[in-house]
Design a protein with these regions (language model features):
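Short, small-residue-enriched loops and turns at beta-alpha junctions
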Residues: 14, 18-19, 133-135, 240-241, ...
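Fold-level recognition of mixed alpha/beta catalytic cores in primary-metabolism enzymes, strongest
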Residues: 98, 102-213, 351-361
Length: 375
């Protein structure tokens, strides 16, 4: 078993369901300390955070990731114990195997190999790790970046070890992410008897025309790097359960994944205009979980593509698809951000797994990126 695979297994054994870390940062921190990293814990209980640096000055190349995992789900649906790594036919099974304890192991072993060869590298090699990525994402990377900005400490390049690959390791590199705007909508009507609709005001009927317009609206056409903006209703509830009662209230949750063609203010104004025009009586709460970001071609994306090409033979597709990541908290500070990791086919699923060969290849790619950017 290679060092990276062994470390992946050691981390999987720690049931770090968000926001718990279960000692994962201690394991990684001890290895980094042996390399003479300056380790700083920036915890906001119960969230654990590690900011570790080797070297001084700029450029600062940061590897970022999270130790927390989503719950395993029903144990009986797993072929193996989700927190006891099992290897079958070159594949390791366990919660967090792909998302993203293999990524953490790969970047740690890559750092060990790189520093052994280049102890006096230029600039700074840094790690930013948290146990609050799968949860609210309030006291993790978001808060650590606030601390660093206040000092000020600036990251130049950041590699997020999220599982970015689709069919083959390295086939996809994320160079940005769409923004995420959510709304919590309450439509106020008047409850009544279904036989006397003139004495009531049905909130479902009030919202329906506006919702139809929102659901079919073309927000934009996207651009060469971003898909078009999308609007989706995620939750909708109204009524008492009785067949003869007009509901007095409707609650809805919706989400917009938006490109760089949009702004939060513009979308909020559009939605309120549509609701007002349809004379909907409502209250609306907004939640912005991240703004869109995009890393333009440059040293980081070049190094990433070169490393992928050298060790896989693939020309990586540069993509901004998928959900949000902690890159959304790092990019606004001016850092260039990419995401490169193992396959994402089984993340958040039962029987989550990772190919052991991919973990070792990821180590090689990460080490090569360190060489290209810090030597």
């Amino acid at each position: 078993m290679s060092p990276a695979v062994a470390l992946t297994a050691e981390l999987i054994r720690r049931p770090s369901v968000s926001p718990e870390d279960k000692g994962c940062l201690d394991v990684i921190g001890e290895r980094l300390a042996k390399l003479k990293f300056n380790n700083e814990r920036i915890d906001f209980a119960p969230v654990a955070n590690l900011w570790a640096k080797h070297g001084t000055g700029h450029p600062v190349l940061c590897f970022a990731g999270h130790t927390d995992v989503v719950p395993s789900g029903p144990r009986e649906e797993w072929q193996t114990d989700p927190f006891e790594p099992v290897i079958r036919n070159g594949i390791m099974y366990g919660r967090g195997a792909a998302d993203m304890k293999s990524g953490l192991a790969a970047m740690t072993i890559a750092a060990e190999r790189f520093i052994a060869k280049h102890p006096d590298h230029k600039g700074t090699l840094a790690f930013l790790l948290t146990s609050d990525e799968e949860g609210p994402s309030v006291d993790g990377t978001r808060r650590v970046m606030q601390v660093l900005e206040a000092r000020p400490e600036k990251i130049d390049w950041c590699v997020v070890g999220e599982p970015s690959s689709g069919e083959k390791l390295g086939d996809t590199v994320k160079i940005g992410r769409r923004g995420s705007l959510s709304g919590k909508l309450t439509v106020h009507g008047i409850q009544g008897h279904v036989a006397y609709p003139h004495l009531a005001d049905n909130p479902v009927h009030l919202l329906a025309p506006a919702l139809a317009e929102l659901a079919t609206r073309e927000w934009d056409k996207g651009n060469s790097f971003f898909q078009p903006t999308t609007f989706q209703v995620s939750n909708l509830s109204a009524g008492t359960g009785a067949p003869n009662v007009i509901p007095g209230e409707l609650k809805a949750r919706f989400n917009i994944r938006f490109s760089t063609e949009q702004s939060v203010e513009k979308m909020q104004a559009t939605i309120t205009e549509i609701l007002d025009r349809h004379k909907v009586n409502y209250t609306l709460e907004w939640f912005v979980s991240g703004l869109p970001f995009f890393t333009a071609p440059g040293p980081l994306s070049d190094a990433t593509q070169q490393a992928v090409k050298e060790f896989t033979g693939l020309t990586a597709t540069l993509s901004t698809t998928g959900g949000t990541s902690d890159g959304r908290f790092i990019a606004p500070t001016g850092a260039s951000v990419v995401e490169l990791g193992v396959l994402n086919a089984t993340i958040h699923k039962v029987n989550e797994c990772v190919r052991m060969a991919d973990v070792d290849t990821l180590v090689q790619m990460y080490e090569r990126m360190m060489e290209l950017l810090l030597t």
